[in-house]
Design a protein with these regions (language model features):
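A short glycine-/small-residue-rich loop at the edge of a beta-strand within enzyme catalytic domains
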Residues: 216, 220, 231-234, 249-268, ...
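Short, well-ordered secondary-structure micro-motifs
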Residues: 76, 181-183, 205, 301-305, ...
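Extended hydrophobic-aromatic, low-complexity segments
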Residues: 214-216, 226, 238-240, 270, ...
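Nucleotide/phosphate-binding catalytic cleft detector across ATP-hydrolyzing
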Residues: 2-63, 67-193, 211-213, 222, ...
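Glycine-rich beta-strand-to-loop/alpha-helix junction loops that act as flexible
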Residues: 65-70, 197, 288-298
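Acidic, glycine-rich loop-and-beta core segments that form the ion-binding/anion-interacting portion
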Residues: 180-248
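Nucleotide-binding motor/catalytic cores of P-loop/tubulin-like NTPases across gene-expression machines
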Residues: 211-214, 292, 296-343
Length: 373
């Protein structure tokens, strides 16, 4: 498991940022996306910050963090508001009132909301395509999707960052951050799923009609593939990781057997994903298919197996935005970190949900890190 750190410069009026530096350092003290050893986690953050500062020549004080632990969950809720203006025109105040009521309807015992986004609107019982502001009616209703996290896990992350000397500007679900880079507006409109395969977790985000309609995290990841190879060949974890990534291959490790081991674990992953799609009635029904990112997305079997098991078009993410970036741009395993840059540039607001951070005035220099896979 690694901590990915990116330092970007985003010139005023530029459509894409310049990558100043991107570094990856070992992560300790984290299991399945949440902190299990606070001192080790603090050391991991501090080590990553120091290396990024050394390579970029920039002092890092503030950060946008991604989080993708197994304690994340998504829940739908509803809210409403009686239109406040005498002429019945829907105002931003009415919209905020309905959204607040929807969030307050969620049971938050031991949990905190880290992201929320409207799924649909109704005005006087009729569906409203797009934003309702400026329309006229009596009662506004909204359905939202909120992503929550165990309060203890979130507090541990904030504490670790503070002890490492870094101010947390915002915390964003990892697959939501990756979607900012990996998905197009057209894909979001017709229906698409982002699958982020991390070391110990797989997180998914489903979009339709331009909004987030589904989200889940599964306690399985590319580390499980490494463990399976180690058991299958009775070798060390280091050797197994090298075989998984293709950096070593010999006659003593038959390719067919390696592929069978990897395929079996990937099949488990896609079976879990399809189960969730069936739950939200989208199995085989996303025209823009599946876009796969993360450190576990690089194996040659991933695309074909996803296509067969999910019955959807599938590809490993490779958005044009990355090719337009200047500097040491990495592969799709870095999509979460780059996606945080898109969120952070929105002048203090997340473009598609609650949260966001950073300043977009002049040159945008921000420390972006993918700490929890």
């Amino acid at each position: 498991m690694v901590t990915r750190t990116v330092v970007l410069s985003w010139p005023k009026d530029a459509s894409t940022p310049d990558v100043i530096t991107s570094v990856a350092t070992p992560t300790k003290g984290v299991r399945h996306g949440y902190i299990v050893n606070l001192p080790d986690a603090v050391s991991s953050i501090r080590r990553s910050v120091e290396l990024a500062e050394k390579e970029s020549g920039i002092t890092i004080k503030r950060a946008i963090f991604s989080i993708g632990g197994t304690s994340l969950s998504a829940e739908n809720s509803n809210g409403s508001a009686i239109i406040s203006k005498s002429d019945g025109e829907v105002s931003n105040f009415d919209i905020k009132t309905a959204l607040t009521q929807a969030e307050e309807a969620i049971e938050l015992k031991n949990r905190k909301i880290i992201f929320s986004s409207p799924v649909s609107w109704k005005l006087d019982g009729k569906d409203v395509p797009g934003k309702p502001e400026g329309m006229h009616g009596v009662k506004l209703e909204v359905k939202i999707l909120s992503i929550t996290c165990l309060a203890q896990h979130l507090d541990d992350l904030l504490s670790a960052a503070a002890e490492a000397g870094v101010e947390v500007v915002d915390v964003v679900p990892s697959s939501v951050a990756a979607s900012e880079i990996a998905l197009t507006d057209r894909q979001r409109a017709v229906g698409v799923m982002l699958v982020n395969i991390g070391a110990e977790t797989v997180s998914i985000a489903i979009f339709e009609n331009g909004v987030l309609i589904g989200f889940s995290v599964f306690p399985i990841g590319s580390t499980d593939i490494t463990n399976d190879i180690a058991l299958g060949f009775r070798i060390t974890l280091e050797e197994a990781e090298s075989i998984k990534t293709g950096s070593i291959m010999a006659t003593s490790y038959p390719k067919r057997k390696v592929d069978d081991i990897i395929e079996a674990r990937l099949s488990d992953i896609f079976e879990l994903i399809d189960g969730y799609l069936k739950k939200i009635k989208r199995s085989g029904l996303l025209p823009a298919g599946v876009v796969i990112t993360g450190g576990g997305a690089g194996h040659a079997l991933v695309e074909g197996l996803a296509k067969d098991m999910l019955r959807l078009p599938s590809r490993v993410g490779a958005q044009e935005l990355l090719s337009n970036m200047k500097g040491p741009v990495r592969d799709s395993s870095w999509f979460v970190s780059y996606g945080l840059a898109i969120l952070g540039k929105e002048n203090g607001e997340s473009p598609r949900g609650k949260g966001g951070g950073g300043s977009a005035k002049g040159i945008f220099k921000e420390f972006l890190r993918q700490f929890l896979p």
